[in-house]
Amino acid sequence: MKAHDRASVLPHTGAMRTTDIHSYQPRQGHGLLHDPFNAIVGPRPIGWISTCNAQGAANLAPYSFFNAFNYVPPIVGFASIGLKDTVRNVQATGEFVWNLATRDLAEAMNTTCAAVPPEVDEFVLAGLTPRASTLVRPPRVAESRVTFECRCTQVQQLHGADGTAVDTWLVLGEVVAVHIDKALLRDGIYDTANAGHILRAGGPADYFTVGPEQLFKMHRPR
């Protein structure tokens, strides 16, 4: 009996039967009502990124592809599908700010998704307050409870496995200054469970929140 056949007839092992698995090759289509990729790789933290152009005009936009990539030094990054104003601004100034999106700021964050001309100030559009950063030129969102001031380390156009360039741009930056609402610090520890983070899910209008009820602890084996 082959290994894959054996796995399919031994349900007590916890392995799924091969007949219960939907498999596909993305370049040939997923065969479902909606591409599940974003829903599977998620929920994801939101890259709510503020930048400014060389003349100092501010821009604010959310990105659903965002995460941390290194601890020391701290490096975060986001991907932009298309060479948008945010990426152009980072290329021009070498700086950006990440602003934490929380449940109370969800509507304002969503407003900054709007496709508007470069001269439109998303801070004004969303009724948000720009606050001067300490080390970089782009402003922070004053209403955001956590902000990272970042200096760009690289901007990279992505490529597929066949070497073909993709119209998506990865921006990485070192976090050079951090600002945290002191109410979120409990005995010197950041209280993620009660900070109200919102996360991007798979559907076009789907989001998740993080709360204490989702918290569980599991230590690494020694």
Model-based region annotation:
Residues 4-222:
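Basic, polyanion-binding surface patches
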